[in-house]
């Protein structure tokens, strides 16, 4: 069975990219069990708690990341360097259980997947 990786690279509310990626991720979970979710660059902001997108008239989809384990999606990786570059604490209570990885380890995990979809 093909292993599919979803890579989130954009901030959550500047475009619909994150929401569309999450929708695609949930749809793909019906087709394969081998899914990895990766966050790098501004994509790490997707998992910050206590966001208030309704104040800028955006839909709050961030909490939906928290239900990924219910879809048997448990391989989730966050680029530690991206977190630090944005001045965030690695001890943040992310909305999803993630494994923080150094960039080299993050790329190595991503290389294990057959298909990569970037959002």
UniProtKB/Swiss-Prot annotation:
In terms of Gene3D superfamilies, this protein maps to: DsrEFH-like
Subunit and interaction comment:
Heterohexamer, formed by a dimer of trimers. The hexameric TusBCD complex contains 2 copies each of TusB, TusC and TusD. The TusBCD complex interacts with TusE.
Q: What's this protein's name?
A: Protein TusC
Record-linked PANTHER family? PROTEIN TUSC
Q: Which domain of life is it from?
A: Bacteria
Kindly state a single biological-process term from the GO annotations of this entry: tRNA processing
Function (record text): Part of a sulfur-relay system required for 2-thiolation of 5-methylaminomethyl-2-thiouridine (mnm(5)s(2)U) at tRNA wobble positions.
What family does the entry list?
Belongs to the DsrF/TusC family.
HAMAP family noted in UniProt: Thiourid_synth_C
Give the keywords, sorted: Cytoplasm, tRNA processing
Organism, as annotated: Pectobacterium atrosepticum (strain SCRI 1043 / ATCC BAA-672) (Erwinia carotovora subsp. atroseptica)
Can you name a GO cellular component term? cytoplasm
A Pfam family the protein falls into: DsrE
Q: Where is the protein localized?
A: Cytoplasm
Coarse class of the primary localization is cytoplasm
